[in-house]
Design a protein with these regions (language model features):
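Conserved acidic catalytic loop of the alpha/beta-hydrolase fold
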Residues: 72-90
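Gly/Ala-rich beta-loop-alpha elbow adjacent to hydrolase catalytic centers
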Residues: 94, 98, 102
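Conserved alpha/beta-hydrolase catalytic His-Asp/Glu region
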Residues: 127-132, 145-208
């Protein structure tokens, strides 16, 4: 089993396949590296594909202190993987919690990024939803500590942005729920309390987003309601970003629509690798509603 060790001594389990420029996949709260199996098989044919389990998700270490978990730490853990594999730069691909970590990696370690793919990112970010989200994160952490993972998975797997997977792919949804139930209750609770609840709102990061210059893809499902407006916010403020929306899809787009997801991400990476990824033309930003040149 392969592990990278962070600067605070936490071991992160990872798997890799293929060769070429590294692509590091960063999983969501309700998933782990197994969630990226469709991507590991697909992108491992062309790239050095790497997926790892975040701290708190066995077989990675599970620190028992909430202070060991934070949004900054999640971004720095990606760097620990990158340093361990001996690569200078990598394409970083994240979903949900992993999408937030990918964005923050781009902010904190932009010089180490070949590109950023930020998926399903934004829930709880809107100013009028911020305190509601913090309260829900605290409630989830308490529920995990009290009732454990199996009971939690039975509720969380049927949320409003998860039923799309159930309707399209009942077997895939059952597998998603089974893997979620196998997670560490302590690690998941600490992740909710330390990372999710305490992370800054995207609306507080606008100036930081404006400084991102590496090629960026923002991707979300059109029924992932909490992530749609934040996706537009990121598109507006990252000049090197494109926004892709997968129709009739919820939150876990990489397992819900793996072929479409792989196609979109694959086209993005190919453009980046060829040096053809565009930056927004400043003339595209106008105060004109009708489209007249100022």
């Amino acid at each position: 089993m392969a592990y990278a060790t962070t600067d605070d001594g936490v071991r992160l389990y990872f798997e890799e396949t293929g060769s070429g420029h590294p692509v590091i996949f960063v999983h969501e709260f309700a998933g782990d590296l197994r969630s990226y199996e469709p991507q590991m098989r697909h992108f491992g044919k062309r790239y050095r594909a790497i997926a790892f389990n975040a701290r708190g998700f066995p077989p990675s270490d599970v620190p028992t202190n909430v202070s060991s978990y934070s949004q900054a730490r999640a971004a720095d853990d990606i760097l620990a993987i990158l340093d361990h594999i001996g690569a200078t730069k990598a394409h970083i691909v994240g979903l949900s919690m992993g999408g937030f970590a990918t964005l923050h990696f781009g902010i904190r370690h932009h010089a180490r990024s070949l590109s950023l793919c930020i998926g399903g990112c934004g829930y709880g970010a809107e100013p009028d939803k911020r305190e509601i989200f913090r309260a829900e994160a605290e409630m989830i952490a308490a529920s995990l500590r009290k009732d454990g993972m199996v009971a939690f998975a039975e509720r969380y797997a049927y949320g409003p942005t998860r039923v799309q997977l159930e309707n399209k792919d009942p077997r895939g949804h059952a597998e998603f729920k089974r893997m979620l139930a196998e997670h560490s209750a302590i690690g998941s609770a600490n992740t909710q309390a330390g990372v999710q609840r305490e992370r800054p709102s995207l609306y507080d990061l606008i100036e930081e987003m404006k400084r991102i210059s590496v090629p960026t893809l923002i991707i979300t499902g059109d029924e992932d309601w909490p992530c749609l407006l934040p996706g537009i916010l990121m598109k507006q403020n990252i000049s090197s970003a494109a926004l892709s929306v997968i129709p009739n899809s919820g939150h876990a787009i990489n397992i819900e629509e793996p072929e479409e997801y792989n196609r979109i991400v694959g086209d993005f990476l190919a453009q980046v690798e060829s040096g053809r990824w565009p930056h927004r033309d400043p003339r595209a930003v106008s105060a004109s509603i009708t489209g007249m040149r100022n």
